Amino acid sequence: MSMKIEVYTKLYCAYCQRAKELLRIKGMDFIEYDITDDQLKAAEMQLRSQRQTVPGVFINDTLIGGCRELFDLDEQGELDVLLGQLTLPAESK
């Protein structure tokens, strides 16, 4: 299955830089939408996420959240699973 990762960012946003760096470390390609001067893309992000803050991270059209949520998922080991880099162990029967 092809993974689609989209990240809405602003030019001088440190949180955006951190989120993108984490995705790069994970070896993931992503589509970046710089909404610094793009009102149309900013409105699109707000409509999709129901929030106005960046970054806005979407994986397969599902809102993951921002930088904090992305790092929280990583710390819990759930980001690798979500990105398809790790599978959950099968439950014992």
What is the predicted role of each segment?
Residues 1-29:
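Local sequence-structure signature of Cys/Sec-based thiol-disulfide redox active-site neighborhoods
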Residues 14, 40, 65:
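Short alpha-helical
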Residues 29-41:
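Thiol-based oxidoreductase modules, predominantly thioredoxin-like and allied folds used
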Residues 47-53:
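Thiol/disulfide oxidoreductase modules built on the thioredoxin-like
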Residues 92-93:
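Charge-patterned, long linear interaction tracts outside catalytic cores
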